């Protein structure tokens, strides 16, 4: 009986040691993994755009659908972020015109979200511009921006924290909507058969045809999920 008891204790000890080893190896795997998923609930994207002759811009939010960032040991960044174009909102208008603006932005005149429901930012390279006092880095990012199935190069700066378990990136991206065929009341005009505006022949040559800013500003604050829970 005593021998059986000792045998049970020995087997239990060996099993617990193996289990502990597996857990330690699992943690090492997680911490060495370079791929981080964006925390959709803690990341924010705000858009700004408006009229050329107004001191106030329209602005609102848009949600990230999914995103994955890769960070190498020498702090090189790559990855892809998918934007949910149907989630676009407006925050500056407080009356019944809010819904009208949102619907117009979703229409073929602008982003045509029924046909193109996502946009994409694909980071292709990065470089450190300077190390900041708080151990964060100011980095230059080169990326491909795809909107309405049209892809254009984009370059922007971001302040990143790469040393914490939760990585962060804050910055601003500015793009010209004409690069993606969004030319409603723009300085540049190319015929788009999907746009209602192209059917209004009488006002195309007036000043009102060029009243909306071509540049759209995107302010972003991105946070990843903790790296130690991510396993490929």
List each model region and its residues:
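Low-complexity, acidic/polar, glycine-enriched regions of mature
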Residues: 17-232
């Amino acid at each position: 009986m005593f021998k059986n008891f000792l045998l049970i204790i020995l087997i239990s000890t060996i099993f617990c040691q193996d289990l502990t080893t597996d857990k330690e190896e699992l943690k090492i795997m997680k911490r060495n993994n370079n791929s981080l998923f964006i925390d959709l609930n803690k990341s924010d994207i705000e858009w700004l755009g408006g009229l050329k002759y107004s001191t106030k811009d329209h602005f609102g939010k848009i949600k990230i659908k999914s995103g994955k960032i890769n960070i190498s040991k020498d702090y090189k960044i790559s990855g892809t972020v998918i934007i949910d174009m149907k989630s676009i909102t407006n925050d500056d208008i407080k009356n019944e015109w809010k819904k009208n603006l949102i619907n117009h932005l979703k229409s073929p005149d602008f982003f045509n979200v029924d046909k193109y429901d996502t946009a994409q930012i694909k980071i292709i390279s990065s470089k450190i511009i300077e190390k900041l006092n708080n151990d964060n880095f100011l980095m230059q990012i080169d990326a491909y921006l795809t909107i309405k199935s049209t892809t254009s190069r984009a370059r922007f700066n971001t302040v990143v924290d790469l040393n914490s378990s939760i990585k962060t990136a804050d910055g601003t991206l500015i793009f010209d909507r004409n690069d993606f065929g969004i030319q409603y009341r723009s300085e540049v005009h190319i015929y788009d058969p999907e746009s209602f505006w192209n059917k209004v022949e009488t006002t195309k040559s007036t000043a009102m045809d060029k009243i909306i800013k071509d540049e759209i500003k995107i302010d972003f604050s991105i946070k990843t999920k903790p790296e130690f829970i991510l396993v490929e």
